[in-house]
Amino acid sequence: GKSILQSSKWTYGVIPDEKRTMIANEVVGMLYKMLQEEIEVLSSHHLVEAIYSDLEEVLYKLMLAEKTYAYELSCYPEKEEQFITEYNNLNRVSLALKFMMEYVAAKPPKGEVTLGIGKYEYILAICSLIIEWAYKNDLFHYNIFNTPVEILKSDRIGMKQDEFYTIYQYGDKYRREQLYYNSSSDFHKKYTINQENYSDALDIAFQAEYGYSFTQFCRLIMGMIEYGKEREEQEVYIAPKEKLIEYIVQIDEKLSNEIAIAIIKDISLTERDDFLKVPSGFRKEDVYPWRFNRAYSFNRRPVIIRNDMIIWGNRQLYHMLMYVTDLIYEGKISTKNDKMCTLIGRISDDRGRKFNKLISDILSDMEVFVIDSNVDRINKKPVADKNGNTL
């Protein structure tokens, strides 16, 4: 708030609604400048490795929490709020770490200051605030929030928390249900949606989209993970690019040098002139750390290339593979390729039909309702909205 006031563009009091995005943009800009200044003085020596090590630790804790939540709750129901708070904090730290990693990978610092704990936490706090304010700016821009913004006499920027709390409640309820469901899946095997085998079609679509098959994509990742497993004393792995590719090609005859190089390129973050300027072929939003489902993000590109060296962690690689697979099977992966679009449409249609059957089975087993599945007409009249669109 103090920095905003010093710009002489703003004064104390409530900001007009039409200027909320303006002040949010200014806050994000100031925070981003602070981030640039803090990172550019750092030494690159072991910087990526330090961030990556923390990312691996946080991911381990997140995966553990997601697998054990239902069991922990059964044993210690009085600790539910503590579990949720810790889980949410881990997610916030993970987002900040990924943002810092994406920035450092794009703009490796050339300073001489060794990153200390205090400086590290300060930079992560800046990263977290950028994500928070930029996300709020989107909420203002799309008129999702009507919350007034006010510059307080204490030189802080204040907002009433009612709307934030309401949205948080909805998200919190969903997160708890999802955590409980995913961590107790062994207890509810009766009702499941079994996916069809799309492996052949997925290989063809992947080949058309990226120049290699999904099978080759998976095998390359498994090869890198195997390379890491042979070096169990480490958690973050560093290998010369040529040596790693030679290793993978030797243990997997299905992969060639050309394919391995192409896949590694597509799952890597590299240095570029401007962090905010997206590489060719991507949307500008793909480098915004507060946006979801970004094609050019650490979630999709957990390999860091530094000169001719490759840096990665096995947990992040495996998480990326699961993440991409989920995007495909949930119909969320961005694509302009006809074959991939056709496959995504087919998967979505199949998933919809299976979901309808699942709900029908659950209701039928209650032995209370008469269930007719896939009904599109009632008394010979189409089930449609007021515009005639079939429901």
Predicted regions and their residues:
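Acidic, metal-dependent phosphodiester-chemistry machinery of nucleic-acid enzymes
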Residues: 1-369, 375
